[in-house]
């Protein structure tokens, strides 16, 4: 079924822009409800997303465009990711060891119970059921 341009931009006589305005939480409400801890969590999470994007860009240039891998940049971006992840762990009172152990339990206990990778287990994703 194909929708006309008008149908795409008008749903229940509301423009898409108006729908977004109606459904998105207002910025002031977010700010008003944010304490210092929440602001720090947001800051660290945004940092992780940004640095992950920069790392992905470096990898994209190598894999997609055939450029030499800029290992120095990869090291820098991985270091930046560690910085933000440590900040997030700290504000949440979590240790790196605790997180790595939980991930190991998830991978070996649910996803890859055999202890080795297989396409079948990866597709099954028992940890996501």
Each language-model region and where it sits:
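Flexible "arm" and connector segments at domain edges
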Residues: 1-129
């Amino acid at each position: 079924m194909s929708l006309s341009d008008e149908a795409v931009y008008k749903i229940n006589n509301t423009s898409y822009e108006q729908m977004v305005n109606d459904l998105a939480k207002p910025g002031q409400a977010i700010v008003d409800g944010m304490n210092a801890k929440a602001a720090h969590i947001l800051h660290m999470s945004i940092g992780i997303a940004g640095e992950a994007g920069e790392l992905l860009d470096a990898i994209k240039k190598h894999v997609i465009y055939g450029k030499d891998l800029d290992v120095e940049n990869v090291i820098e971006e991985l270091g930046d990711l560690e910085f933000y992840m440590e900040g997030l762990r700290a504000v949440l009172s979590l240790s790196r060891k605790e997180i790595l152990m939980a991930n190991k339990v998830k991978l070996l206990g649910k996803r890859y119970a055999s202890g080795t990778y297989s396409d079948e287990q990866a597709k099954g994703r028992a940890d996501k059921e």
